């Protein structure tokens, strides 16, 4: 059965929090007021205001929503992060940091990791993380918004405040709760 594309006029999003309001803000920014968008959420089940982590692909969503980064960080008590730390990763009291971005520089012959492995085998490669600008910056606790040679980063933010922020964006685009 084929459905006429103009037969759907109402969209209902069930569930709030960051996921629900993210969906509402995204959909409403794409289709605007051509559709009636309603978000249904419980007043009894609140958003947990704990820290929420993102990854660099999050920027695509923020570009879609035309979010001003400085305002956003202020409103959601956000901080910048350059990677994800995995505590007790291999052994107790050892950690591994997965840095965002590329490690080393590949060339036409092969990927960087091939050269690094050969160097390690021969005894003259440093730790793999030493070749990551993001990891080096994270360990030095340094970050700056650069125009060129930007570091890859993401955010750590308050989930409750982020849900409220997204709700305001969605409601500006005619989403009704």
Name each model-derived stretch.
Residues 109, 149-168:
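Short beta-strand to alpha-helix junction loop
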Residues 28-50:
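Glycine-rich FAD pyrophosphate-binding loop
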């Amino acid at each position: 059965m084929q459905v006429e594309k103009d037969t759907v006029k109402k969209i209902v999003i069930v569930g709030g929090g960051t996921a629900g309001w993210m969906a509402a803000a995204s959909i409403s920014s794409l289709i605007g007021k051509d559709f009636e968008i309603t978000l249904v959420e419980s007043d009894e089940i609140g958003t947990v205001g704990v820290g929420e982590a993102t990854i660099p692909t999050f920027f695509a969503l923020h570009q879609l929503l035309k979010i001003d980064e400085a305002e956003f960080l202020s409103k959601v008590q956000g901080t910048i992060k350059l990677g994800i730390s995995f505590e007790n990763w291999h052994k107790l009291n050892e950690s591994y940091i997965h840095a965002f971005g590329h490690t080393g520089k590949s060339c036409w012959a092969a990927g960087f990791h091939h050269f690094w492995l050969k160097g390690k085998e021969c005894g003259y490669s440093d730790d793999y993380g030493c070749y990551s600008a993001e990891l080096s910056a994270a360990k030095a606790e340094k970050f700056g918004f650069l125009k060129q040679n930007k570091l890859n980063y993401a955010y750590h933010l308050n989930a409750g405040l982020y849900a409220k922020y997204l709700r305001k964006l969605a409601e500006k685009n005619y989403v009704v709760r």
